[in-house]
Amino acid sequence: MILIFGGTTEGRMAVDVCEEAGKPFYYSTKSALQQVELCHGVRLSGVMTSDDILNFCHQNDIHCIVDAAHPFAENLHKTIAETGIKVIRLQRQFGDKIDGITYCKDYEDAIQKMLQSGVLNLLALSGANTINKLKSFWQNHHTVFRILNREESVECAKKNGFPIDNLIFYPDSMPDVEEEKRMMSVVGCDAIITKESGETGGFEAKVKAAMALGLKVFVVEHPQLPADWIYVSGSHTLRRAIQHLVPDFFPLKTGLTTGACATAATKAALLSLLCDEYPEEVSFALPDGEVLTIPVECSSPGTATVEKDYSDDPDVLKGCRITSTVMPNKTGDIRFLHGDGVGTVTLPGLGIPVGDPAVNPTPRQMITNEIRALSKVGYDVRISVENGSELALRTFNYKVGVVDGISIIGTSGIVSPLSNEAFVESIGRELQVAKAIGCTAIGFASGKKGENALKEAEPDLRVIHYGNFVGEALKKAHNLGFQRVVLGIMIGKAIKLADGHMDTHSHKVELDLSKWGVTMARQLWDVMPPSFFTEIEKNCWKHCRTVFPDGELEVRLIRDANV
């Protein structure tokens, strides 16, 4: 069983990830104030003592703790460490240190540094729980505290004898830089103190506003946590960590794209050149900014290999070895050269020049970002795949004009399982969660691009990925009584659906584009008239109506982008 400690934005993220498993887990918060959507999770509210936590873990067979609590919940972090249970820390990003800020290791250190700096009028943005910690300062120096406008925060101030007239409250929404500047000007402070709370909590706006006004800024650094915990920074890395510690929790395992593997291999190869290091693992950023750390093999300067890990997706490339060789060039540019086992592009439409190695645009950008973070000179990057030419014969690369090898692909860096019964069941579980939290409308998209397009039009629409299982997703939505469905679909899948195929996988339905004179479905947007797409939408709607007979149904064609 898994126990999550939350009450934060990260806590919500952990809940969303664990709900995907469709199995019970516990979610504990200090109070019941946080509204969180639970279907399979069990909510625990209230302060737990050390003994309470230890007893609960023992009685409920807790094998993994996800610590998604606030960075400054020091007593809780200490108790979690004492359980002896494996811990995953869902850690927010803190960013680099900022010049001009005085960093403090704790509140005692902050008080000493504020006294030395001659602070006379302090604005404390560190929360009600720090009123007591800063007491020796505010008893002798004018201080205004901004706190949450709730009873327990005000009571905390009263309990510590803080002047109620010197309290101000956060607005309903997180203030931006200009709003923070106006507030600070009204308060008339000459310094602020806040916590190193990371990218959430408005830290950046507070600091930018104060520095723009010429105020002194004191930041209390976040406490250090045990080195033997597993640290993750987002939903993908959290799921991978849970898969590692509790292998049977998720019915399906996610994996890495070839693009993610090539990026990690390239970074390791470059590090071996620049630093004479041979790392056993490297960290790199996924397209959404989440940082992932994976094992690498690096035994000679400029060359490194990553073995593509195993997911539950029926992927012919599982376990293949992807190698990157990096050498400096004199052009100042990053160039992608041909490597064994990686195909050559022979037709337009992929967003890659004809004749280039089939390293798709998103992996190219990921690789470029990692190189540029380390060096500004030019490099030649040669990606190769062991047995890639043979593996390519088991793919559909030839249909898009990629010959003599595989493509290095991936828009998210993560492979989500798409093609078995368990994935269809996971669609049902996500729909059950949506229904349980009161959703009457649902969006369906094949993947992340479609989800982004639907959410751009309707930010509050809950979107579920159907992969290729359009019919199954719509049936389940109908059976659960959803009143409205918005189906986002890209043109290639839409043509199959318009022809009556409710499973759009290329293994099930082949798409013959030659009759339109194109080689890639996305090229249809450039050669066909608007009436063509209107007709496609109408036919898609007609077939979807057979499995979603009641309620409002919308079909939206989504214009594809380069993968």
Segments predicted by a language model, with ranges:
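N-terminal beta-loop-helix "entrance" segment that forms/cooperates
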Residues: Y26-M48, D99-T102, V154-N160, V291-P295
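Short, polar loop motifs at secondary-structure junctions
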Residues: Y27-Q35, L90-G95, A128-I131, L148-E152, ...
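Glycine-rich, highly charged phosphate/nucleotide-binding loops
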Residues: H40-N60, F169-E179
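Anionic-ligand binding region
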Residues: G127-L167, V177
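A C-terminal functional module that forms or caps the active site or interfaces directly
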Residues: K158-D165, Y170-V187, A191-L213, F218-H222
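Generic N-terminal targeting/processing segments that precede catalytic cores or assembly contacts
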Residues: F249-Y398
